[in-house]
Amino acid sequence: MTRGERACPLAVLLALVTSCATHAPTAPLLTGSPGASTQPPPTATAPPSASVVADGWRIHHLLVDLHTHVEATPEHLAQAVGTFDAVGIGVAVNLSGGIVTHEGDRPSAFERNKSLADRLSPGRFVEYMNLDYAGWDAPDFAERAVAQIDEGARLGAAGFKEFKRLGLYLRDQTGHLLKIDDPKLDPMWHRLGELGMPVSIHVADPKAFWGPYDRSNERWTELKDHPSWWFGDPTKYPPREDLLAALERVVARHPETTFVCVHFGNNAEDLDWVDAQLDKHPNMQVDIAARVPEIGRHDPGRVRALFMKHGDRILFGTDFQVYDRMTLGSGGSGPPPTDADAVEFFQKHWRFFETKDRGFAHMTPIQGDWTISAIDLPADVLAKVYFENARRLLGKRFPGRPASP
């Protein structure tokens, strides 16, 4: 595939996909003339479905997964790219690019990861940087955080990922949890905006993770395998609502910075909340990673309306992970998924977005025992969600694919 194919505008792609279906031979205008057809004039052919159009995008590997975690080893990169090739993902954003601080003379984790991915899989991965919180209690940490961002930009980081460490895991020297909206981080958020580096930010977790830690919890299968994901002890963790409120304060304080609030705004259970936040904050976007099982439980008409309204600010992502084992959105102690399972995982995303199917099994069974219903998005909205929004978000940092030999 050439650079030109990847830069091809949507209109041209639609034409490529639809040409065979819509270009029928033209019948002579005057019947009875030499060579005139004796058959009735052909009827107009219906345009292809959005799913057929999307198949064309997948053939050309145009889709962008904005939310992946892939360990930079030759084996793991190859496994990830094999899956992406099979399902039509051209570019994946690795949110675990690593920190940019050095250990002695050794290159930083970010440099090592980016260098290997660029060498072994050129044009396939975009690397986000992560923050090193060492020295949080030092008086100059705010300046050091900004310096890390500047270094990440110099090294080619396309964006910044903040995990759910803030508010739930990281603590200062006195034992208090670091707050999402701590003023010490404001210079960093501001600098990211100045540099045009988008922020993918994860705060809180599913509402059920604040519920009882027993079989009555609808996410028990997941929680029992991940006890550190349970935050229902109020003596250790803040209410989920407090974390979401802190996130909103950060987004509001930094209108010049683009925040991609992952996992459908970190609150897929509440569509009205997500809708209201997108209305209120033009600098907020959301990805759908690991939350289609939750989104798909809602009334499909309501979900579709939200995607139609905010289609310019919703991004495709999956939380596909490759470390010592592959993870498809979430995982547990069961057998590791196979490459065939990974293909099916992506195909269920296509089914959710591109069909009208009702009551089918979702792609991440460990996340809950329920079914989901599809939302049948039109091709123009699918294009935005699948790749156009990501290209716009990343701008000049979006990779060109190397020319074909």
Give short role names for the model-derived ranges.
Residues 50, 54, 107-231, 282-285, ...:
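Active-site gating/metal-coordination segments in enzymes
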Residues 1-10:
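Bacterial N-terminal signal peptides that target proteins for export
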Residues 64-68, 91-94, 125-129, 160-162, ...:
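Hydrophobic faces of well-ordered beta-strands that scaffold small-molecule active sites
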Residues 21-23:
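Bacterial signal peptide processing site
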Residues 17-19:
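C-terminal motif of bacterial Sec signal peptides marking the signal peptidase cleavage site
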Residues 74, 231, 235, 241-249, ...:
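H/E-rich (His + Asp/Glu) clusters that bind or coordinate divalent metals
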Residues 68-77, 98-110, 134-143, 170, ...:
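Acidic-and-aromatic substrate-binding clefts and catalytic sites of carbohydrate-active enzymes
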Residues 27-123:
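An N-terminally biased module of ancient metal coordination in phosphate/nucleic-acid-related enzymes
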